[in-house]
Curated annotation (Swiss-Prot):
Listed GO MF terms: glutaminase activity; pyridoxal 5'-phosphate synthase (glutamine hydrolysing) activity
Entry annotated with the keyword Lyase: yes
InterPro entries: Class_I_gatase-like (IPR029062), PdxT/SNO (IPR002161), PdxT/SNO_CS (IPR021196)
Protein name (database record): Pyridoxal 5'-phosphate synthase subunit PdxT
Family, similarity comment: Belongs to the glutaminase PdxT/SNO family.
Protein encoded by which gene: pdxT
Enzyme Commission number, as recorded: 4.3.3.6, 3.5.1.2
Source superkingdom: Bacteria
Cysteines joined through disulfide linkages: none
Reaction it catalyzes: aldehydo-D-ribose 5-phosphate + D-glyceraldehyde 3-phosphate + L-glutamine = pyridoxal 5'-phosphate + L-glutamate + phosphate + 3 H2O + H(+); L-glutamine + H2O = L-glutamate + NH4(+)
GO process terms (BP): glutamine catabolic process; pyridoxal phosphate biosynthetic process; pyridoxine metabolic process
Name of a matching Pfam family: SNO
Residues holding L-glutamine: 47-49, 106, 134-135
Enzyme active site: 79 (nucleophile), 170 (charge relay system), 172 (charge relay system)
Length: 196
């Protein structure tokens, strides 16, 4: 049994919970710092990254979230969650949690009216993964320890750095659970390593 939390400060929380629910997975909605202790993995949902950062600071999550990732526990960030994880944000002096060695650009694919859906090849997940882009960021560049798992044209939209997974789009807004299953597998593998 693995325990995965969805950070519930803002964003598509219930959609992520629905996608994560599976035999052998206990999913919880995380609203308090002390809930992090029992988790094996954590999801940062989409939303608005600046607002999410304000709430992270307000409720004392900043250092505990960094410590959670530093323990080698898997973290999965989608859309605004991806921005929270990046070490660098284009046009800004610094990142937020600065977990993944990458530079992201906010709203890279346009504002809400320019949102779109497409099918993508995502390494380790599938070659027909439905991707819903809503005011999505893109990953401009990644460090040498970061693997690019998917591109839309020439733009990086999914990357992984060890136990950290970042995605520009919203896999939780489709009925395809393969992306979340991929993350669940990351969590199971990390827990096995931690226990050995």
């Amino acid at each position: 049994m693995v325990k995965i939390g969805v950070l519930a400060l803002q964003g598509a929380v219930r959609e992520h919970v629905r996608c994560l629910e599976a035999p052998g997975v206990e999913v919880s909605i995380v609203k308090k710092v002390e809930q992090l202790e029992d988790l094996d993995g954590l999801v940062f949902p989409g939303g608005e990254s600046t607002t999410m950062r304000r709430l992270i600071d307000k409720y004392g999550f900043f250092e505990p979230l960094k410590a959670f990732a530093a323990q080698g526990k898997p973290v999965f960030g989608t859309c605004a969650g991806l921005i929270l994880m990046a070490t660098r944000i284009d046009g800004e002096d610094h990142g937020h949690l600065e977990l993944m060695d990458m530079t992201v650009q906010r709203n890279a694919f346009g504002r809400q009216r320019e949102s779109f859906e497409t099918d993508l090849i995502v390494e380790g997940v599938g070659d027909d993964v439905r991707a819903v882009f809503i005011r999505a960021p893109l990953i401009q560049e990644v460090g040498q320890n970061v693997d690019v798992l998917s591109k839309f044209g020439d733009e990086i939209v999914v990357a992984r750095q060890g136990h950290l997974l970042g995605c520009s789009f919203h896999p939780e807004l489709t009925d395809d659970r393969r992306f979340h299953q991929y993350f669940v597998q990351m969590v199971k593998e990390a827990k096995t390593i931690a226990q050995s």
